[in-house]
Amino acid sequence: LFWVENGILFFEYKPDVILNLNVAKKVVADRIRFQNEKSYPVLCDIRGIIDTDKSGRDYLAHSGSMLTKAVGLIVHQKVSITISNFYLHVSKPTVPTRLFTSKEDAIDFLKQYQ
């Protein structure tokens, strides 16, 4: 689910998603098509992801950054935060990327990239 509000692109994963390479490629292709060649700061709610694999994470860290100015990831569990922090340090996304448990904090971070 994608929408733009106040210059920020919002994206929410559906519940119980297993993020593998095929899912990552589809999500990125759908987002790029939705954006119609315009770059945005992106708020991505990943609370619906229940599992990932390395190829999916790597794809998002690199190809998933196309047409993004910065990314705020919304997480809700300590396990998600730990895994996501590990992802940020190992995969090294190509745009500024931070984790948040609060949507408002993520929006504040992304406003500087509008």
Give the positions of each predicted feature:
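Amphipathic, Lys/Arg-enriched alpha-helical "gate/interface" segment within cytosolic domains
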Residues: L1-Q114
